[in-house]
């Protein structure tokens, strides 16, 4: 499986009720998944936990057979080889502009990455 969630909970400080509770799912590489539900049901919280932008309070998230989140242990978002595009987008605030641009440039030489970053910065 490419993505596996096992009994994932997401909790926000000061909130009695979890934003996400006991979610389990699996997706194979190339498979498309859809999250639907009313506003406030936890869709964005779950996606943020998968992307590493929110810690999980229980359960675990596995990407490409590697555990990337579980209670007390979360791989940084830039090490997950995935990202999200939000309606109100933002960059990774802890990365430089160049590193934000390079985030999606996997499998390229440093020279090719530098060239692409320079190209994008000229736009």
Question: Model features per residue range: what roles?
Answer:
Residues 3, 18-20:
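Conserved structural motif at the start of ABC-family nucleotide-binding domains
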Residues 13-14, 95-113:
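ABC-type ATPase nucleotide-binding domains, specifically the catalytic core motifs of the NBD
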Residues 67-83, 107:
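ABC ATPase NBD coupling module
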Residues 51:
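Helix-to-loop junction immediately C-terminal to a conserved catalytic motif
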Residues 36-38:
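The feature captures the beta-strand-to-loop junction immediately N-terminal to the Walker
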């Amino acid at each position: 499986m490419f993505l596996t969630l096992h009994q994932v909970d997401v909790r926000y400080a000061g909130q009695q009720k979890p934003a996400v509770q006991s979610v389990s799912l699996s997706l194979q590489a190339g498979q498309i998944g859809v999250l639907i539900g009313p506003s406030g049901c936890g869709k964005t919280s779950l996606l943020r936990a998968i992307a590493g932008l929110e810690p999980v309070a229980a359960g675990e998230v596995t990407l490409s057979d590697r555990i990337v989140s579980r209670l007390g242990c979360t791989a940084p978002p830039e090490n997950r080889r995935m990202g999200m595009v939000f309606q109100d987008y933002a960059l990774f605030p802890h990365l430089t502009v160049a590193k934000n641009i390079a985030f999606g440039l996997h499998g390229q030489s440093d020279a090719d990455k530098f060239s692409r970053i320079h190209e994008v910065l000229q736009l």
